[in-house]
């Protein structure tokens, strides 16, 4: 359906159809964010020997996150007197908009994707980097030392881990011969790339956690060091925009890992009768659980350790993986 619309002449009808689909995707993502946060809190509670949310919405706390959102909407929206007001207001939007834009190229099934472009993987990596501009802008515009330090940490972390992230997927591009995410999924019909590219998967997973600013790489918003990091001065809905962008990227990165390394919607052998959307959801949920598990398990590392690990460990391993993949492809394929 979407491919037919893309190839049809421009019209207001097509515009409103695309707008409606975009709104549906936005609500689907917001639903994931709402209950993804709840699931994270419940899993963390279980792993730490606690119950987790259990008051609002029954014994499982099903409406706890909804109540939190309503609370944020009702909070005062304050702007510090010394802040750069235009940039302070604009920063959350700059941080959130790219997070939603990258979802356009993710193929959730073979029939559901907003933009099937030839350089989908490159588009995702390029657009996702814009969010750091919003983070740094918010930190600087707040005119707060903690916020500025958080923004600078975010910039340094993004530079350090964006390179290994990109390098780790070059092996996949070499094997699939394309930057198109649909073609990468199709190339995994017989064997998933997690088995062909285990080194690339490990490097990508670690770099992805760093890009998401999640534990153990959550230095830009380290509560015990920087109060709340780059969004210390934000409150209410503007603060919610920063949190929303973080969890939308969580959704996007888990989807991208599913597409690149877990075969997307391709089924396990002899279970092809199960719909592709179900397979995608199962793989996606496994990645989300793994990332939550990381948050509970690992302590935060120091800034110097973060930089050294990115430049001295991940980058050389990613480069070695490229040469190894090119050699194997040249000799055996």
Swiss-Prot record:
Keywords: Cell membrane, Membrane, NAD, Quinone, Translocase, Transmembrane, Transmembrane helix, Ubiquinone. Disulfide bonds: none annotated. It is an enzyme of class 7 (translocase). GO terms for cellular component: plasma membrane. GO terms for molecular function: NADH dehydrogenase activity; oxidoreductase activity, acting on NAD(P)H, quinone or similar compound as acceptor; quinone binding. NDH-1 is composed of 14 different subunits. Subunits NuoA, H, J, K, L, M, N constitute the membrane sector of the complex. PANTHER family: NADH DEHYDROGENASE SUBUNIT 1, NADH-UBIQUINONE OXIDOREDUCTASE CHAIN 1. This is NADH-quinone oxidoreductase subunit H. The gene is nuoH.
